[in-house]
């Protein structure tokens, strides 16, 4: 979800996992010059919305864990080369980073995120992905508002009311 540079040789990586929810990993090596690959981790795959298979230390109540190995679970076809898709991926990753604050796992949220990664990568039309993403994520997290159709009907009625009173 998010990467924070800690020093020249280490970064903190916030990842949302199916089993543990939001987890903080320390990844060593490859922050500036030097090697891009460290301890079985290719740093180039640590991008916003990367769907990874990871191996780390045992999660036993610690808040910071060490990542030992990572590889892509889903290899994007278009996301890596399309700047618009990359910008949307950064927006989605930042939204997830800000909204998923606790280390609680939720299979529905994890599956939704994975489906959105594939959708962002493969969809021909990406214009409305950001608003749909936020709306559907809000509903999954329990912040669901009025359905979109009702909102559009209210907006249309308000617009007609404004036009008729002018």
Predicted regions span which residues?
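Non-catalytic alpha-helical scaffolds and adjoining flexible linkers that form interface surfaces
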Residues: 1-11, 16-166
């Amino acid at each position: 979800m998010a990467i924070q540079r800690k020093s020249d040789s280490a970064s903190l990586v916030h990842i949302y996992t199916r089993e543990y929810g939001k987890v903080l990993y320390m990844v060593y090596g490859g922050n500036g010059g030097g090697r891009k690959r460290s301890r079985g981790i290719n740093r180039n795959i640590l991008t916003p919305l990367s769907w990874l298979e990871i191996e780390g230390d045992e999660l036993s109540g610690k808040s910071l864990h060490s990542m030992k190995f990572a590889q892509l679970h889903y290899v994007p076809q278009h996301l890596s080369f399309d700047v618009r898709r990359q910008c949307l991926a950064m927006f989605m990753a930042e939204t997830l980073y800000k909204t998923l604050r606790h280390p609680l796992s939720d299979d529905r949220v994890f599956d939704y995120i994975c489906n959105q990664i594939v959708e962002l990568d493969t969809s021909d039309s990406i214009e409305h992905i950001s608003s749909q993403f936020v709306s559907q994520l809000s509903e999954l997290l329990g912040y669901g508002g009025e359905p979109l159709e009702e909102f559009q009907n209210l907006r249309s009625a308000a617009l007609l009311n404004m036009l008729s009173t002018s």
